[in-house]
């Protein structure tokens, strides 16, 4: 006795489910790297500018604490990308701790994840109580993270003066 395509939809498993699991795993790595780089930036910024507040002085952990530093110390108060990132991090946490379920342990839907499903119907899909990651989801999320980094860069980099060619 073994697995056959009569008792299990092997096509669905190998073309949708396994790729989704791989994408979920990649999302954990991507966000882990992003959190690490944001933390390194905050520590470096604090040293370079001898700030009164360090990253360790702030509550929270991971990306949330890094953003709190960027908001309070660096001064990026109105990030357009950060609200989107908070939804993606909710999804990441569900992937890491709850098998990518869109419901919490008390069976209540997680609003941020439901909003992502509504916002990206071609990239994320509901499979019962789980979220499936389709092709393109990670690239879309990477673009959101890139937008956030560009906001930080634009905020900390003074506008360049273009030299005048004529007096």
Task: Kindly give the residue locations of the regions a language model identified.
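C-terminal/domain-terminus segments
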Residues: 110-120, 154-167
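A hydrophobic membrane-anchoring alpha-helix module
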Residues: 133-163
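Charged alpha-helical initiation segments
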Residues: 1-21
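Charged/polar interaction segments and conserved charged motifs
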Residues: 1-5, 49, 112, 166-167
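Amphipathic, well-ordered alpha-helical segments in soluble domains
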Residues: 6-9, 37, 91, 144, ...
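Flexible secondary-structure boundary motifs
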Residues: 24, 28, 32-135, 139
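Alpha-helical protein-protein interaction elements
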Residues: 6-10, 112, 140
